[in-house]
Amino acid sequence: MAKIIEYDEEARQGMLAGLDKLADTVKVTLGPKGRNVVLDKTYGAPTITNDGVSIAKEIDLEDPFERIGAELVKEVAKRTDDVAGDGTTTATVLAQSLVHEGLKNVVAGSNPIALRRGIEKASDALVKQLVASAKPVETKEQIAATATISAGDPEVGEKIAEALDKVGQDGVVTVEDNNRFGLDLDFTEGMRFDKGYISPYFVTNAEDQTAVLDDPYILLTSSKVSSQQDVVHIAELVMKTGKPLLIVAEDVDGEALPTLILNNIRGTFKSCAVKAPGFGDRRKAMLQDMAILTGGQVVSEDLGLKLDSIDLSVFGTAKKVIVSKDETTIVSGGGSKEDVAARVAQIRAEIEKTDSDYDREKLQERLAKLAGGVAVIKVGAATEVEAKERKHRIEDAVRNAKAAIEEGLVPGGGVALVQAAEKVEKDFNLEGDEATGAAIVFSGIEAPIKQIAENAGLSGAVVIDKVRSLPEGEGFNAATDTYEDLMAAGVTDPVKVTRSALQNAASIAGLFLTTEAVVANKPEPAAAPAAGQDMGY
């Protein structure tokens, strides 16, 4: 495909136009009085959302240089969402602010490389200050307040706090559709591990790209499943029962994988294959954990079991298995509670005995997977569009609450960044363009507060001046239009969300400023309209 190339200021301005189009669309959602954005879909009803990363994903610009600029900001939102589960809009607003201020200085003659170094040093110092000032989460009420802010709904905050209280920090909270109106919370025992389906052809739910198996048989093996003969024998055993099959193995490849996929596509036999988690002895131990949880046996030649001669007695069972691209959740395994309790006691004893910090950490992970359980928040609403939007907000709020438990809380509403900057800036000594880069960060971090204020119908400049005069921890509560102690009022952000937003925004800003040429695909010419046909009259 032919390429088009732009250099210097023209390249940066083209990318900046794309960044602005995306950021201006996303930033209207920031804060408790932010607006929603309606996303048109090719099929089905439109989606209404205030989630930054969901909006960013839907924006695809026509101009190739604008598209590249927008894609870079999408990366900011996506990275922040991946790490912290929230803060995508804050990250986008910060990126826009840093890039605009940075480009002004580049045009004025500043060295882009030195500016980038200054931006990186200032953002690193701010992150250290944020982490040092974070307060640990100690109560269920703090979790509820954090989740409430993320979801914009007190009922959601209470449900998430209750769910995390039941499963613990290491437990799993999932969000599902509900046939009834409102929110329900169910708690089921289960296990989640970080391996997804081997092939996307196993997907049963195209919308969220997951494979959902109801009441499946589960085959656990420490070896590879490669031969067609083995997989046909396994399939014949399970097909007689009319139930789906989950295979957890070292790998599924050779003739076995296409055989499973073909039967899946034809609808002959529903199955899914995933790789076993871990390596070496740890993998064997985790497979044994799964076997105890599901009431099955690990098929291993060490135990004299071969795939071509097994029967149904070695298969485990579960009420449901949900497999995504990256992880697998086994809900309500069919193993006995006594066996699971004995296994948990055994792992706890191993934790007490080990002298290795690494081994202790891995044993604790296994314990959490085996004993943590799964909480399911079921979401129902008046319309499908509303249910989808609410479900998405709850998923973000769950990750937000977990981030708070993990690293602690700071005052919300963008205040933590401004107050951290006031402390860091006093003792920050850089020279030349590096100092200019740091100054870009110290002024750019005001952008989230200003946008929250403007979305609430107030002047951003007036609010930021007032916030700078307040004692530490106090700031602007946009929900009530008051200045108060934000921590006491429950207006908080997980420090993980705030620092991730800043780190990712600073990273992309540095890339923007140091871009000297952009190579883009040349747009295809529009197809000519079809010529009219002679009607034969």
UniProtKB/Swiss-Prot annotation:
GO terms for cellular component: cytoplasm. One of its GO terms (biological process) is protein refolding. InterPro entries: Chaperonin_Cpn60_CS, Cpn60/GroEL, Cpn60/GroEL/TCP-1, GroEL-like_apical_dom_sf, GROEL-like_equatorial_sf, TCP-1-like_intermed_sf. It is found in: Cytoplasm. PROSITE patterns: CHAPERONINS_CPN60 (PS00296). ATP binds at T29, L30, G31, P32, D86, G87, T88, T89, T90, G413, N477, A478, A479, D493. GO terms for molecular function: ATP binding; ATP-dependent protein folding chaperone; isomerase activity; unfolded protein binding. Its EC number is 5.6.1.7. It is an enzyme of class 5 (isomerase). Together with its co-chaperonin GroES, plays an essential role in assisting protein folding. The GroEL-GroES system forms a nano-cage that allows encapsulation of the non-native substrate proteins and provides a physical environment optimized to promote and accelerate protein folding. HAMAP family: CH60. Forms a cylinder of 14 subunits composed of two heptameric rings stacked back-to-back. Interacts with the co-chaperonin GroES. This is Chaperonin GroEL. It comes from Bifidobacterium animalis subsp. lactis (strain AD011). The lineage of its organism: Bacteria, Bacillati, Actinomycetota, Actinomycetes, Bifidobacteriales. The gene is groEL.
